[in-house]
């Protein structure tokens, strides 16, 4: 595959400075906002039910993340999502911890039933639980399962009529027909809380400027993975604190040329 067509999306994000409306969790709010700013997007965190519909209507993308789940936030997510749908604003959903508790799983299945999603992004366990496939989960982490990640992703894309993104050691992007695997990234990402949540919001910035959502997601994942590799090369021996700071630097400094040089993607049959 031609990495150049994906790398161009990074430049487009930085030229366009898209507004990304995040209804995310309290653990990752600051990291998400700083990561989007470093990339070149414009983050807004608006949660009040009195304003979410209006804010979502003017955004380039809406990101719904249920990490620290409360009923009032679910209400706000539904209001924002329906407004985004009505105004042709792409909606991304991160079903954090789906399968961990019955309430969390119920919400993770209810939101896609009520809102048309451009992207759903999670680990294998989360996505499997959204579509009621058996996969063990540990807290909000992936746990273990016997399923085929590519098959789970394709099934989710088909059942939810969306682009499914499953992230892990390898990342899978599919709309049910096109399936692409991305092999960039670094294990130290798992030692910094919020890197998955930020990733969903970064995909949101890419989706805001590229309407081919498979292409946007692959571009975002490749960019994010390469940035993490470049950051780790400078800091991994120091530890996750140093990595987190350098990762923000690399979100600002990683170029389209870096993606073309270091990107590792494969389209599956």
From Swiss-Prot:
The lineage of its organism: Bacteria, Bacillati, Bacillota, Bacilli, Bacillales. GO terms for molecular function: ATP binding; hydroxyethylthiazole kinase activity; magnesium ion binding. This is Hydroxyethylthiazole kinase. The gene is thiM. InterPro entries: Hyethyz_kinase, Ribokinase-like. SUPFAM superfamilies: Ribokinase-like (SSF53613). Gene3D superfamilies: 3.40.1190.20. It holds the Pfam family HK. Belongs to the Thz kinase family. Disulfide bonds: none annotated. One of its GO terms (biological process) is thiamine diphosphate biosynthetic process. Pathway: Cofactor biosynthesis; thiamine diphosphate biosynthesis; 4-methyl-5-(2-phosphoethyl)-thiazole from 5-(2-hydroxyethyl)-4-methylthiazole: step 1/1. It catalyses: 5-(2-hydroxyethyl)-4-methylthiazole + ATP = 4-methyl-5-(2-phosphooxyethyl)-thiazole + ADP + H(+).
């Amino acid at each position: 595959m031609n990495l150049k067509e994906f790398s161009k999306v990074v430049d487009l994000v930085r030229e366009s400075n898209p507004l990304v409306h995040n209804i995310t969790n309290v653990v990752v709010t600051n990291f998400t906002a700083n990561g989007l700013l470093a990339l070149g997007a414009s983050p807004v965190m608006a949660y009040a039910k009195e304003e979410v519909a209006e804010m979502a209507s003017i955004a380039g993308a809406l990101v719904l993340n249920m990490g620290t789940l409360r009923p009032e936030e679910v209400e706000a997510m539904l209001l924002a999502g329906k407004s985004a749908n009505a105004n042709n604003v792409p909606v991304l959903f991160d079903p954090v911890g789906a399968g961990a508790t019955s309430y969390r799983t119920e919400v993770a299945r209810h939101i896609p039933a009520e809102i048309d999603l451009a992207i759903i992004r999670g680990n294998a366990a989360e996505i499997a639980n959204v579509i009621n496939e058996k996969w063990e989960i540990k807290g909000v982490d992936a746990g273990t399962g016997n399923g085929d990640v590519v098959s789970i992703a394709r099934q989710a894309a088909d059942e939810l009529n969306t682009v499914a993104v499953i992230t892990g050691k390898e990342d899978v992007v599919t709309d049910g027909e096109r399936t692409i695997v991305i092999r960039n990234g670094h294990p130290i990402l798992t030692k910094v809380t919020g890197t998955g949540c930020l990733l969903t919001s970064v995909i949101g910035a890419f989706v805001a400027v590229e309407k081919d959502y498979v292409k946007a997601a692959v571009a975002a994942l490749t960019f994010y993975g390469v940035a993490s590799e470049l950051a780790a090369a400078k800091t991994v021996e120091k530890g996750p604190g140093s990595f987190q700071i350098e990762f923000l630097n690399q979100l600002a400094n990683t170029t389209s040329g870096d993606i073309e040089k270091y990107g590792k993607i494969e389209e599956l049959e």
